[in-house]
């Protein structure tokens, strides 16, 4: 019994969690935050920032000395000189050698310094690129979010219209039975009802597709249970429309990320020119090397008189012709000297500086300078183009927002008029003073007016978001 109660409790808990998960409605802030944290493009941009940091480490490493160590062991097989006789004999000798080399750039035409400055600028550019990517994702999410809201409200309108038409169809049946309207009018209402059903299905499909688009930006897989809050207020909370286009442009000129990217890329191009020019200057390098070797052959440890041939004639005394004799000795061989004794005895060192002056390199350095100058001119043009694009975009966005506001206000006024006309038509139709064609026409005009209010409302909201974006107001509050 206790086991059954425990299982029931677990089942209720799982069911409760599932219901909560399905009933969760996402806010715009949650959508934007989640997209920034999980979007694949942003993750790739973060990797670019890491690569820029690695490039800086490489640039710093150019100021440090290079150290290389080497060691070798060799076997010499074949004719080798015998140290006791001086003759060549077939034998095997072994040698071990080791060494180390240190090199450092003392002067390289300021290329190392400019490379480090370029690496620092590349880090800044990568950070700006990441910020730009997040801003673009936030705008795309906001647009997709508002599209979901529009489709949700549009579905409500279509369902409400279907409900009204169902009631109207029932009322028309009563009027036909009473003889107030002809049966043909009932068929017209039935056809309109079928069209309303089709509109509901179309609205449901549009809502599903918009949810799919938004969930794709958020990298969510369960888009069917995905939903957003019904936040539909049309408000200019930051009073952005009170600003002038020139004021918005000045604010955007100071803080827009795409301008910062273009300016940073211009500085990088300037450093590339300096690096390329450095190839014309001489380079000065310092070096130090150490080496030693160890042999494993027998060595001469002493001499003893040669008993079989104690002396050798080395000359004659002038006048007497007496022989001049020299004692003969035999070399005594011993084991090789200890490893570290040989290593210490045979060590050698060298150090110095090397100056290299470029004279002619097949126009390679000159062409690199010319290429870097062309890239610099492109960067200057890109900055100028970004300024022009920003100015055009700001003024266009302001005009679009103003036009969207006027369109929204006009659509609201039109809806009020259409609602009054529809109410009047309903009264006339209910007493048989209007035919079904005219009544359906009034109903269609009302539905179109409701849809137009929704369209202009969300268009205005998004246009306001874009203006705030240029003015430096974030889409979400931290």
Per-region residue spans from a language model:
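Small/polar, glycine/serine/threonine/aspartate-rich low-complexity segments that form flexible
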Residues: 23, 70-104, 232-240, 287-357
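Sec/SRP-type N-terminal targeting helices
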Residues: 43-47, 60, 92, 106-134, ...
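Short segments within alpha-helical structural elements
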Residues: 47, 195-220, 409-473
């Amino acid at each position: 019994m206790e086991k059954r109660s425990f299982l029931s409790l677990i089942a209720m808990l799982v069911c409760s969690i599932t219901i909560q998960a399905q009933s969760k409605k996402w806010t715009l802030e949650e959508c934007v935050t989640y997209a920034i944290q999980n979007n694949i493009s942003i993750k790739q941009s973060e990797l670019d920032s890491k690569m820029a940091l690695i490039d800086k480490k490489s640039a710093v490493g150019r100021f440090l000395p290079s150290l290389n160590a080497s060691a070798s062991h060799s076997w010499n097989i074949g004719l080798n000189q015998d140290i006791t006789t001086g003759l060549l004999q077939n034998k095997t000798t072994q040698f071990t050698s080791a060494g180390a080399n240190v090199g450092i750039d003392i002067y390289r035409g300021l290329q190392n310094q400019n490379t480090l400055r370029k690496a620092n600028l590349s880090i800044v550019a990568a950070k700006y690129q990441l910020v730009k990517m997040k801003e673009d994702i936030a705008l795309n999410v906001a647009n997709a979010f508002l599209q979901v809201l529009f489709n949700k409200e549009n579905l409500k309108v279509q369902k409400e219209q279907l409900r009204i038409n169902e009631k109207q169809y029932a009322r028309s049946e009563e009027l036909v039975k009473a003889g107030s309207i002809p049966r043909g009018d009932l068929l017209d209402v039935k056809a309109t009802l079928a069209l309303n059903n089709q509109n509901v299905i179309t609205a449901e499909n549009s809502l599903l597709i918009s949810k799919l688009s938004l969930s794709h930006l958020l990298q969510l897989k369960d888009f069917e249970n995905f939903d957003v809050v019904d936040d539909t207020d049309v408000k200019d909370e930051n009073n952005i429309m009170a600003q002038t286009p020139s004021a918005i442009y000045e604010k955007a000129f100071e803080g827009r990320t795409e301008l910062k990217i273009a300016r940073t890329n211009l500085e990088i191009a300037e450093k590339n020119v300096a690096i390329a020019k450095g190839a014309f200057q001489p380079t000065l390098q310092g070096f130090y090397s150490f080496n030693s070797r160890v042999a494993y052959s027998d060595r001469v440890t002493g001499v003893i008189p040669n008993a079989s041939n104690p002396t050798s004639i080395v000359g004659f005394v002038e006048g007497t012709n007496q022989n001049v004799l020299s004692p003969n000795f035999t070399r005594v061989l011993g084991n090789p000297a200890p490893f570290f004794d040989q290593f210490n005895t045979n060590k050698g060192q060298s150090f110095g500086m090397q100056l290299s002056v470029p004279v002619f390199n097949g126009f390679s350095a000159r062409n690199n300078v010319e290429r870097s100058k062309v890239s610099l001119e492109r960067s200057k043009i890109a900055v100028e183009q970004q300024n022009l694009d920003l100015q055009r975009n700001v003024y266009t966005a302001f005009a679009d927002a103003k036009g969207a506001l006027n369109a929204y206000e006009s659509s609201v006024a039109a809806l009020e008029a259409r609602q009054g006309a529809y109410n009047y038509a309903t009264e006339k139709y209910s007493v048989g003073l209007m035919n079904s064609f005219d009544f359906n026409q009034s109903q269609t005009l009302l539905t179109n007016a409701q849809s137009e209010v929704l369209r202009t409302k969300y268009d205005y909201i998004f246009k306001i978001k874009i203006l705030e974006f240029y003015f430096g107001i974030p889409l979400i509050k931290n």
